[in-house]
Amino acid sequence: MRIFTRLLYAAPSNMGSAASLSEALALLPPIPLYRRILRVHRKKLDPEMRILGDSYVKSEFRAHRGTENPLHIIGFLTEWQLYAQKLEGDSWIGEKLDQGKLDKMSDQQLGQLYELMQTIQNKDGKGEGEGESEK
């Protein structure tokens, strides 16, 4: 990601939902943010979910490495920084996805989200029988 210094420290007042950005926050550069997310995974997630989360974060940061559009960069960094803050504060447990964000997703993104949900459910043992066998 090629990022200008002025973009790194811009307050993303128009990105994300108003509730999640009640205070203006300075964006972390990509590498420190990446390290912060991996550190939070190490502290907050169980080993199986940490492996899944780490591999997902690595693939997303690799996929967006060549992004040059400033709006995409700010949006990407903002969402990952909010994710890290939620994990650090334990406010993510039991939280549902915002309908506005779901509406903005492309078909490919919705497919990826569905695959992620299936993977998580299979890790928990819920997805194997699709809820038919309860013990």
Curated annotation (Swiss-Prot):
GO:BP terms for this protein? gluconeogenesis; mitochondrial respiratory chain complex II assembly; succinate metabolic process
Top-rank taxon, per record = Eukaryota
Primary location class? mitochondrion
Is Transit peptide one of the keywords? yes
The disulfide bridges present are: none
- Which Pfam family, giving just one, matches this sequence? Complex1_LYR_2
Q: Which UniProt keywords apply?
A: Chaperone, Gluconeogenesis, Mitochondrion, Transit peptide
- The residue stretches assigned to a coiled coil in this entry are none
Subcellular locations according to the entry: Mitochondrion matrix
Give a GO cellular-component term. Answer: mitochondrial matrix
Which residues does the annotated transit peptide occupy?
Answer: 1-12
Q: Which InterPro entries match?
A: SDHAF3/Sdh7
Record bears the keyword Transit peptide: yes
Family of this protein: Belongs to the complex I LYR family. SDHAF3 subfamily.
Q: How does it assemble?
A: Interacts with the iron-sulfur protein subunit within the SDH catalytic dimer.
Functional note: Plays an essential role in the assembly of succinate dehydrogenase (SDH), an enzyme complex (also referred to as respiratory complex II) that is a component of both the tricarboxylic acid (TCA) cycle and the mitochondrial electron transport chain, and which couples the oxidation of succinate to fumarate with the reduction of ubiquinone (coenzyme Q) to ubiquinol. Promotes maturation of the iron-sulfur protein subunit of the SDH catalytic dimer, protecting it from the deleterious effects of oxidants. May act together with SDHAF1.
Output this protein's name: Succinate dehydrogenase assembly factor 3, mitochondrial
Which species is this UniProt entry from? Emericella nidulans (strain FGSC A4 / ATCC 38163 / CBS 112.46 / NRRL 194 / M139)
